[in-house]
Swiss-Prot record:
It catalyses: 5-oxo-L-proline + ATP + 2 H2O = L-glutamate + ADP + phosphate + H(+). Belongs to the LamB/PxpA family. The keyword ATP-binding applies. The keyword Zinc does not apply. GO terms for biological process: carbohydrate metabolic process. GO terms for molecular function: 5-oxoprolinase (ATP-hydrolyzing) activity; ATP binding. Keywords: ATP-binding, Hydrolase, Nucleotide-binding. This is 5-oxoprolinase subunit A. It comes from Campylobacter jejuni subsp. jejuni serotype O:6 (strain 81116 / NCTC 11828).
Amino acid sequence: MFKVDLNSDLGESFGAYKMGMDEEILKFVSSVNVACGFHAGDPCVMDKTLNLAKQNGVCIGAHPSYPDLLGFGRRNMQISFEEAKNYALYQLGALFGFAKAKGMKIQHFKAHGALYNMAAIDENLALALCEAVASFDENIIFLGLSNSAMNEAAKKKGLRYANEVFADRAYNDDGTLVSRKLEGALIHDENLAIKRVIKMIKESKVTSINGKEIDLKADSICVHGDNIKALEFVKKIKENLEKEQIQICALENFI
């Protein structure tokens, strides 16, 4: 039987600002990526998010970002190896404090936004993130884009690596994600997106935006629950995976 993890970004509210439908999405996913304060989230939100994850039996991961609250972590930054490593360590430590207080463990590490996209093509940046994870806890799974520089970096640092794919995003011919700024970056046809997901899991292939068949491994599928429509889409994905006898379970069960 095929196994796959469903992950979603959570805890992205902060202060008086509420974002996402965290309570609802937790009913359908097996792992969550918790914002650690640099692009979103704050101590109270982190506390609440971990409580919700624990109540629902969902595994947690750190979701660190560039220090860019204003830009929601989606703006590229040029930072040094040491800065990248230390920013990652700082955010891991923040989440660990809450996790330890609740008797929980950090299952995985997944970079956010621009940090994720840049680390996918910049092995030096990816190595900095992997070094942070390895020095913090070598048992933490590094979750990153399938067939990317992050995968190679994780191997070099001796970390377990989980290959992530996206249900609603288009791919370039080289396996990177099409920029959100470009037309066609998001797939709005739900049935097409679900067919693509099943193909990625069962055949380890996806069709790029230019029609090229590319190889990739799907250990975890990133889904979103920002609004009612997105939530309904996640429910449909889960239902279709179960029909295909694909088992949904957290990464720690098979990576």
